[in-house]
Amino acid sequence: MKILLDSVYIHNGGGKVLLDMICEKISENGDIDNYFFLFDKRYQPISQILKNTNYKYVNSSESKRKEFYKTNSQKFKKFLCFGNVPPPILINKSVDVYFHNDLLIRPLLNNTSIINKIKLLLKKYYIISKNRKNYKWCVQTKIMSEKLSKFFKISRDKIHVYPIYVTNFLNINKKTDNSFLYVSNFAKHKNHRRLFDAFRQASNKIGHNITLNLTIDEREFKDSFYNKLTTNNNLTIVNHGISNKSKLNELYNKSKYLIFPSLNESFGLPLIEAVLSNCYIICSDKEYVYQIVRPSLTFDPNSIESISQSIVNAYKNIGLRKPKLLVENKIDTFVQHIQEYV
């Protein structure tokens, strides 16, 4: 009997990066035939999975998930729900839920619209309603473990911490002076508007050209203030679009600084990737940061002035220090955990 890897709702952003890594590791280990993959219709899997016949695409809805589980759950010995949400029906077998969305912890406090807050709140209560005492949960940091236990009422002994990231970044040290990189999507909590205003302000203070590199979806960038509002001649903004692993590696190698003003993260994978690529890290003074790295400089992400000043300080090498990685990659341990008793 196989393991079901259910990744419905995962198709972009950090969730997709994590899913790609897990699938790649399973393939490397030669264990791919032990799995059946239930994919979100919008997800494009790595090539190794496409060579395997044990997968199915479904629309991103609970009704479609439920339909699949009702028809097929008896075929599987173990279940990994990778999209934050437990099985839609009761499963009396081994179940792991991989939780990696900090926005679901306290939805009403998020920096997003009222409609999104309500949607997230309803999803949170749905997740709680579907949890069972025999289910295990996996997160990436100790703080996420504490939040999940407190706000979802899950016993601590049911939560396991597995930081997961790519370690084989090619560091060829071709840094471009005065180049900043922000790896993120355009979600509101990523804090792009304050970042844009801070860079406009900082470029005026510095008086020399600085470059901000982005990885936003091309359509969102075209419709955004980045493209519509004017900047001075000292600021160059380049959007590279949604980037694959190879392109990201190139961007990290060319960029001297990673700037990361995000207000909420369950992990913050670009912070780790930046350390491995020998970038300085200028980022939000937030708890999620200190769970995984010691940054080069920090700022108040709610203050345009604070972000702007940190950009100036980085440019002038004021208080700048080499960042340090604080977490060990547990991808092998995680995959072993999933395959336990199978």
Model-derived segments and their meaning:
Residues N171, K316-V342:
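A charged, aromatic-enriched C-terminal amphipathic alpha-helix characteristic of glycosyltransferases
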Residues L4, L19-I22, D31-P88:
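Active-site donor-binding segments of glycosyltransferases and PAPS-dependent sulfotransferases
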Residues L4, N173-K190, F196-F199, N213:
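Conserved donor-binding/catalytic core segment of Leloir-type glycosyltransferases
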Residues T53, S224-S246:
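Nucleotide-activated donor-binding/catalytic signature segment of Leloir-type glycosyltransferases, i.e.
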Residues N116-C138:
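Membrane-proximal helix-turn-helix segments that form the acceptor-binding/catalytic region
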Residues L263, V275:
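Aromatic "clamp/platform" in nucleotide-sugar-dependent glycosyltransferases that forms part
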Residues G13-E24, A187-Q201:
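A conserved mid-protein helix/loop that constitutes part of the nucleotide-sugar donor-binding site
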Residues L297-E305, Q309-I318:
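Conserved acidic donor-binding segment of nucleotide-sugar-dependent glycosyltransferases
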